Regions:
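NAD(P)H-binding glycine-rich loop region in Rossmannoid oxidoreductase-like domains
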Residues: 35-96, 203-206
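A conserved pocket-lining segment of Rossmann-fold NAD(P)-dependent short-chain dehydrogenase/reductase
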Residues: 172-189
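Conserved catalytic-site region of short-chain dehydrogenase/reductase
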Residues: 75, 109-114, 159-163
Length: 216
């Protein structure tokens, strides 16, 4: 399958790239600049700014699936504005390219702890990442009105970061709008297993026009 990955050199994007490349898919790895790219034979590395819609659209043409792991940086003081601007531009570029399948890597903040309370509303939610989490939440609401694309929005486990990563188990449980928790009540998943989840979804397409999540 021909897969374009936006944000392919980032923490999540690079893990997804590795997993899909190892499954022998044909990958176009898109990032803002070349420098940390893959050298695998089935990977083509492309440098393009997501805010250049025409150029991005041209690079996406011919893909069977576009995966957006775009993130302007958690320490970026303008992450809220930059994420929403970039996400909307990516969405437009996918449509202009004539690609139907579009998988977005979002955040856990929009998951529901109960029928009314989202993760982002929890008193323990870190203030420093709230702007980015709020942007991802609002972008999910934008996608809910998108009826031209076969979009999917993946919310990682609450504990999905450098400290919980480093191991690929290939095992996970799926969910929809609520965090998947283990026997200890923790929502946790390594970035390597996030990549397994996304690669499996690329191949199976179970959550068209839905948000989904995963955990151990």
């Amino acid at each position: 399958m021909r897969v374009a990955i936006i944000g392919a050199t980032g923490f999540v994007g690079s893990a997804i790239l590795k997993e899909l490349a190892n499954r022998n898919h044909s990958i176009k790895a898109i990032s803002r600049s070349i420098g940390n790219e893959s050298d695998q034979k089935n990977v083509v590395n492309v440098a393009v700014d997501v805010n250049n819609v025409a150029a991005l659209s041209a690079d996406l043409k011919g893909a069977d699936v576009v995966i957006s792991a775009f993130n302007p940086g958690w320490t970026n003081p303008s992450i809220y504005e930059d994420f929403l601007k970039g996400a909307k531009n990516i969405q437009e570029a996918v449509k202009l390219a004539g690609v139907k399948r579009f998988i977005v890597i979002g955040g856990a903040g929009s998951l529901y702890l109960d029928e009314q309370t989202r993760v982002i509303d929890s008193p323990s939610f870190p203030e420093e990442i709230k702007p980015g989490a709020q942007a991802a939440l609002e972008y999910l609401e934008i996608l809910n009105d998108e009826n031209q694309l076969d979009w999917e929005f993946f919310s990682p486990a609450i504990e999905m970061h450098q400290g919980t990563s480093g191991t690929r188990t290939g095992n996970y449980k799926l969910g929809l709008d609520h965090p998947v928790v283990n026997n200890e009540g923790r929502s946790i998943l390594s970035v390597e297993d996030v990549a397994v989840v996304i690669a499996d979804e690329v191949e199976k397409q179970n959550f068209t026009r839905r948000r989904f999540t995963a955990g151990y």
